[in-house]
Amino acid sequence: MSNIVWHAHAVDKQSRAEQKGQKPLVIWFTGLSGAGKSTLAGALEQALAASGKHTYLLDGDNVRHGLCGDLGFDDAARQENIRRVGEVAKLMVDAGLIVLTAFISPFRAERELVRNLVGEGEFVEVFVDAPLSVCEERDPKGLYKKARAGEIRNFTGIDSAYEAPEQPEIHLLNAGKPVAALVDELLTALRLRVLID
C-alpha cells in the first residue's frame, strides 16, 4: 500500500457541496430488521428530493445484490459489509451528496468506524427503535419466523446481538407512529442541527 497515493482533485468536496447548495452528510439508519429503517429512509429521501436536495439511498438488501453479494452473515461478514458501505458513503459525501443508509449495522464498533471514515459533523446516526416483539409482529420478509424455526442462523435480535446506539444523534421510537410523523421528526431534528435548510 505504500506505493499507492491519494490524488487530490481540483474540484473538491466543498466545490461539489456549493454546486449542489447543500451540506453533504451521511444519515445512518440503524435498528432491528422490521424496525422501519428502509421505509423511513425512503420517505426521508423523497422529502429531501422534493425540496431540491441531491441524495442517494444505500439499502442493506440492495448492496447484498452486488457490492456485498459475496458476504455471508457471520460477525466478520457483517463487519466487512458495513466497512464497504462506509467507504462508498464516504465517496458519495465527497461528491456532495446527502447519503441515507438503511442497515441493521448491529455493532457499535462498525458504526463508529463509519462515523470516523466520513468525518466530523458529517455523520448522523438515527436509531430506529422498535421493540423486538413489534419487529417480529411486522416481519415483512418472514425472517423472524424462519430464525425462530432454526432455518436462519446469526439473525440479529434472535441468536445474534444488536448493540443499540448509546448516544445517537436522533432516536426515533417506532412502535406504531405514522411514517409521515416520523419523517417530520427527522426533518425537524436535521434542521435543528443545521444539517439541512
UniProtKB/Swiss-Prot annotation:
One of its GO terms (molecular function) is ATP binding. It comes from the Bacteria. The active site is at S105. Keywords: ATP-binding, Kinase, Nucleotide-binding, Phosphoprotein, Transferase. ATP binds at G31, L32, S33, G34, A35, G36, K37, S38. GO terms for biological process: hydrogen sulfide biosynthetic process; sulfate assimilation. Pathway: Sulfur metabolism; hydrogen sulfide biosynthesis; sulfite from sulfate: step 2/3. This is Adenylyl-sulfate kinase. Catalyzes the synthesis of activated sulfate. It catalyses: adenosine 5'-phosphosulfate + ATP = 3'-phosphoadenylyl sulfate + ADP + H(+). InterPro entries: APS_kinase (IPR002891), P-loop_NTPase (IPR027417).
